[in-house]
């Protein structure tokens, strides 16, 4: 489902832990990392799509998380011309996204990237809140900056109330399955 401007409706998901770190996932078989995201199906609300994508991409269910915030507006990014599929109709030139900030209420062990026969990710780790803004692929950076700026007021109090960590370096976890 592509809108009249050529953008595909999509949801983005930022999952934070009780220390205010965010889940950073490695795309399957690649060296690129990002937040979980995915398209909204016809007849599906953004929230319904978010829960579906949450399970498909990281194996978490509604009971495992709580919604802390959503972006006020849809945020858009354009795909680089080399990634646009010009032979499909209608042509999709980018994504328009509604973002959700979730707090993980269950254990790290409940994260399972093997719920699909074609997994999106093959590993993940907890990183500092602002880390993804500098590390995501360049054409998504502006959207990530805007998302994190909007969610910062919700996550920063979590970081301030969190006990100090024994291991400050991010732990890298392989897929479960």
Swiss-Prot record:
User: What GO terms in the biological process aspect are recorded for it?
Assistant: mRNA catabolic process
Its EC number is 3.6.1.-
**Cofactor annotation:** a divalent metal cation
Sorted UniProt keywords? Hydrolase
* Keyword Hydrolase assigned: yes
State the span of motif (Nudix box): 38-59
Q: Example GO molecular function term?
A: mRNA 5'-diphosphatase activity
**InterPro entries, per database record:** Nudix_hydrolase, NUDIX_hydrolase-like_dom_sf, NUDIX_hydrolase_CS, NUDIX_hydrolase_dom, RppH
Could you tell me which residue ranges the Nudix hydrolase domain spans?
A: 6-149
Q: What class of enzyme is it?
A: hydrolase
Cystine links in this protein are none
One Gene Ontology cellular component annotation held by this UniProt entry = cytoplasm
Q: Which PANTHER family match?
A: M7GPPPN-MRNA HYDROLASE
What family does the Swiss-Prot or TrEMBL record give for this protein? Belongs to the Nudix hydrolase family. RppH subfamily.
What does it do? Accelerates the degradation of transcripts by removing pyrophosphate from the 5'-end of triphosphorylated RNA, leading to a more labile monophosphorylated state that can stimulate subsequent ribonuclease cleavage.
- Protein name, per record: RNA pyrophosphohydrolase
**Origin organism of this chain?**
Cronobacter sakazakii (strain ATCC BAA-894)
């Amino acid at each position: 489902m592509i809108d009249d401007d050529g953008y595909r409706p999509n949801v983005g998901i930022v999952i934070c832990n009780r220390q205010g770190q965010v889940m950073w996932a490695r795309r399957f078989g690649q060296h690129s990392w990002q937040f979980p995201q995915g398209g909204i199906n016809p007849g599906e609300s953004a929230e319904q799509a978010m829960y579906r994508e949450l399970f498909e991409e990281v194996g978490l269910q509604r009971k495992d998380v709580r919604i802390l915030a959503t972006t006020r507006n849809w945020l858009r990014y354009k795909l680089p011309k080399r990634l646009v599929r010009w032979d499909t109709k209608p042509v999709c030139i980018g994504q328009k996204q509604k973002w959700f900030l979730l707090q993980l209420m269950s254990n790290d062990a409940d994260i399972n990237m093997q719920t699909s026969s074609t997994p999106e990710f093959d590993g993940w780790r907890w990183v500092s809140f602002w880390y993804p803004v500098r590390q995501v692929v360049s054409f998504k950076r502006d959207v990530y900056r805007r998302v994190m700026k909007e969610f910062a007021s919700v996550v920063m109090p979590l970081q301030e109330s969190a006990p100090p960590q024994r291991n400050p370096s991010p732990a890298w976890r392989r897929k479960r399955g």
